[in-house]
From Swiss-Prot:
InterPro entries listed in its UniProt record: Dolichyldiphosphatase_PAP2, P_Acid_Pase_2/haloperoxi_sf, P_Acid_Pase_2/haloperoxidase
Described purpose of this protein according to its UniProt entry: Required for efficient N-glycosylation. Necessary for maintaining optimal levels of dolichol-linked oligosaccharides. Hydrolyzes dolichyl pyrophosphate at a very high rate and dolichyl monophosphate at a much lower rate. Does not act on phosphatidate.
Family: Belongs to the dolichyldiphosphatase family.
Ranges annotated as spanning the membrane: 33-53, 100-120, 130-150, 162-182
Pathway info: Protein modification; protein glycosylation
Tissues with expression: Widely expressed with highest levels in brain, kidney, lung and intestine.
Subcellular location(s) of the protein: Endoplasmic reticulum membrane
GO MF entry, a single one: dolichyldiphosphatase activity
PANTHER family on file: DOLICHYLDIPHOSPHATASE 1 (PTHR11247:SF1), PALMITOYL-PROTEIN THIOESTERASE/DOLICHYLDIPHOSPHATASE 1 (PTHR11247)
The protein, known as: Dolichyldiphosphatase 1
Predominant location category: endoplasmic reticulum
Membrane topology: Multi-pass membrane protein
Length: 238
């Protein structure tokens, strides 16, 4: 304990770089882009929330692909060892290497995989209404726009060069295509067997890969069950 009126500081302090983003003071665009560059964290939190409450195998597989994608990014960075932009103002970064950009690779993996899922995996809904198709197009455009803006933010905020975010986007897109093929051709046929494992049944892990529109399915099943219980309750009260 330091004596009253005296201050003692540790030898050094380090920030948590996972959420540490700097932007030029007074720059509104930089401020907004700094928040946008945190999108990968929001995506991961969203996935964890979905897995906890839905416990669906495809969602778990998607998150596993994102984790693998980040592992590949780390490996490439430490093989190429290209530094971040010269003269950059940032000292608190996760790694001194910048090729390829992990933010760009993450967001392009997420966006391209989601794009493929929306247009190839959900093709089974042949009777899709106009609003369903419009929603799919708008969502896809939003995902691709978000990936571009996050990539741009890393250049604007001087964390990466254009080439680093470009190759990050290319790597993420290629990884997304490869993981989508692996999921569809190898993992999806195994999902029913995995869902039947005792440990999966214990944790209520489920497989919805054969249901083209899970949201509509859950809505109709829940509504039917609620009406059935309401009828039973009404019968008991009579």
């Amino acid at each position: 304990m330091a004596a009253d009126g005296q201050c003692s500081l540790p030898a050094s302090w380090r920030p948590v770089t996972l959420t540490h983003v700097e932007y030029p003071a007074g720059d509104l665009s930089g401020h907004l882009l700094a928040y946008l560059s945190l999108s990968p964290i929001f995506v991961v939190v969203g996935f964890l929330t979905l897995i906890i409450f839905k416990r669906e195998l495809h969602t778990i597989s998607f998150l596993g692909g994102l984790a693998l994608n980040q592992g590949v990014n780390w490996l490439i960075k430490h093989v190429i060892q290209e530094p971040r932009p010269c003269g950059g103002p940032h000292t608190a970064v996760g790694t001194k290497y910048g090729m390829p950009s992990s933010h760009s690779q993450f967001m392009w993996f997420f966006s391209v995989y989601s794009f493929l899922f929306l247009y190839l995996r959900m093709h089974q809904t042949n009777n899709a209404r106009f609003l369903d198709l419009l929603w799919r197009h708008v969502l896809s455009l939003g995902l691709l726009t978000a990936a571009f803006l996050v990539s741009y933010s890393r250049v604007y905020l001087l964390y990466h060069t254009w080439s680093q975010v470009f190759y990050g986007g290319v790597a993420g897109s290629l990884m997304a295509v490869a993981w989508f093929i692996i999921t569809q051709e190898i993992l999806t046929p195994l999902f029913p067997r995995i869902a039947a494992w005792p440990i999966s049944e214990f944790f209520l892990i489920r497989d919805t890969s054969l249901i083209p529109n899970v949201l509509w399915f859950e809505y109709t099943v829940t509504r039917a069950e609620a009406r059935n219980r309401q009828r039973k309750l009404g019968t008991k009260l009579q």
